[in-house]
Amino acid sequence: MICIKNGWVHDAVHEEPYIADVLADNGKITAIGKNLIVPQDCEIIDATDKNVYPGFVEAHCHIGLDGSGIGFEGDDCNEMTDILTPQLRAIDGINPMDPTFREAALAGITTVCTGPGSANVLGGTFTAIKTVGKRVDKMIVKKEVAMKCAFGENPKRCYQDKNNYSRMSTASKLREMLLKAREYDRKVLAADSDESKLP
């Protein structure tokens, strides 16, 4: 158990920071308040004149997929075989030993939403993952949290030699995939739990 005492607490609830103690047990905050009563064996950290924040969440990054300092062997950010790859999952490519996880944790970032880059119109799913750990399956907060979709210059630049010269083409490819997804969803609903009728 740890008690961070007398710090300026920024709790994301109150508009202004306030001086208080923060009690944590096994990495989880259990109490916030002034002059908390703590067990005798509790580790005390004096935070007088210091700021105390909850862990930050990085909403969009490629940590664990872009091979920081490794080069080609660790670069799994973009799958360049097809402009549409919605079936790909970040969790299948994340390297938990990527040094950027430790760098993020040291900067106060406790959770990241990491996933594919923006080369593809649909690049695959992002995952929410903790920045501390050695096994991806033990670090996951939520397996699938977003689908990467890119309309900018990257699909044009990356696939110009494969018949994707304009944003019109990019939009057309996305529209085609969304129509397929809608039709698939319609068939699943029509099957009504009858596995023999599932697409």
Which ranges hold each PLM region?
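Flexible loop/turn segments at secondary-structure boundaries
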Residues: G64-L65, N120-G123, N154-C158
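Conserved beta-strand scaffold positions in the cores of enzyme catalytic domains, especially
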Residues: C3, C42-D46, A128, A146
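Gly/lys/ser-thr-rich phosphate-binding loops in alpha/beta enzymes
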Residues: A90-K148
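N-terminal metal-binding scaffold of metallo-dependent hydrolase/deaminase domains
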Residues: M1-Q40, K50-V52
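A short, polar/charged loop-to-alpha-helix boundary motif
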Residues: P39-I44, G67
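Hydrophobic alpha-helical scaffolding
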Residues: I45, Q87-A90, I94, Q160-R167
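Metal-associated gating/positioning segment near the N- to mid-region
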Residues: K50-P116
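Metal-coordinating catalytic core of metallo-dependent amide/deamination hydrolases
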Residues: A128-P199
